[in-house]
Amino acid sequence: MPVPTIQKIEVQGFTWSVAGITHRRAFHYDTGSSLTFSGGTLRVTADNGVVGEFAGWRHDPKAVAGAAARYLGQPALDRERFYQQAKRSGVMAIYDIALWDLAGKMADVPAHALMGTYRTEVPAYASTIDGAVGGPLSTPESFADFAEACRDMGYQGFKIHPYAWTDVRQHVATVLAVGERVGGEMDLMIDPYCLFDTFADALKVGRACDEAGFFWLEDPYSDGGITPFSHTKLREMIRTPLLQGEQVSTVEERMALILAKATDFARADVGRHGLTGALKLAHAAETVGLDIEPHRSGPAELQFLAAVKNANYYEVVWVHPVMRDSEPPIYANVSITGLDCIDDRGMVQVPEGPGLGIIYDWDYINAHA
């Protein structure tokens, strides 16, 4: 059977608005505010008529369209070659995911079956939007209230994206309040995403995490998550595991953090490295006995989790007691984003259709193009 070639590439931008969200240094809830996000869709058609699709990404559609020449006329199954040629490109992952969708549709199996299926459902954690001034998620007690509500829904984990200011006392108080309320009943995490100005502040929060029994502390201070020495030092001084890697660019750099003993968990990023690159990190980490944790929500992340053993959770990202979903409503056949995407056991089902398993709501996408 001849290998199909890529015959046509279509890129379409669209926008979606999320009520109750604003951005001042970080995204957080604000009654009466609304933000409009921009992203797009990619359709890759092979000469056998099979179409690979990926929608909902947040890149400049012109940049995605500008990369089309690299792929047109090329073998549609050469994902590894495309990855090696463009792994530092910001749009490579979008094409990679669409090509995995195409390959799965050609074989009439989910993408995870091509990678090697390990499971078909995954546990999820609720990953909050940042703390705000006033309203829900503005105090340690309100974070604890939300953690308790998520526990009652079935969530097995809860991650705090804390306040966008650096008063470490409030961050410590929030860690302790959440730990006191639901500690021992959920895995607890905190992600300041490189907020704290000093090693000392990171250490204070880390020691609070120790006291509260947190599962991990992620990207604590403003080095950008890239200095192995300081994170190795922090690991020596606290018991709570570190999760690092989101802020560094390549799979190789993330693996280097592992080998430098600068992290306990490594952040995998399907949206940055594609399924091809994320699998490389997962398998490399597995050889040294460590886990990876995928970033963000979406169909590609679920296909990835279905194919790897050494990952613990699906991140249901940017949730809030009032604003329950920040992702565009573009999945017509599945519920895989937003606070309500879990079942009562805290699990999310991996889409089982061919490729990514997604039927897109093209009426919504076209209406917002």
What are these regions (language model features)?
Residues 96-136:
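Glycine-rich, aromatic-flanked loop segments that form ligand/cofactor-binding clefts
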Residues 2-51, 57, 329-334:
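Structured beta-strand/loop patches that form or line metal/cofactor-binding pockets in enzymes
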Residues 120-238:
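Metal-dependent enolase-superfamily TIM-barrel catalytic cores that perform enediolate-based chemistry
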Residues 80, 207, 213, 224-243, ...:
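Shared catalytic-loop signature of beta/alpha-barrel
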Residues 6, 45-110:
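Metal- or metallocofactor-binding catalytic centers and their adjacent structured scaffolds
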Residues 352-369:
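Extended hydrophobic packing segments that form well-structured cores
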Residues 49, 95, 108, 158, ...:
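Conserved, mostly hydrophobic/aromatic
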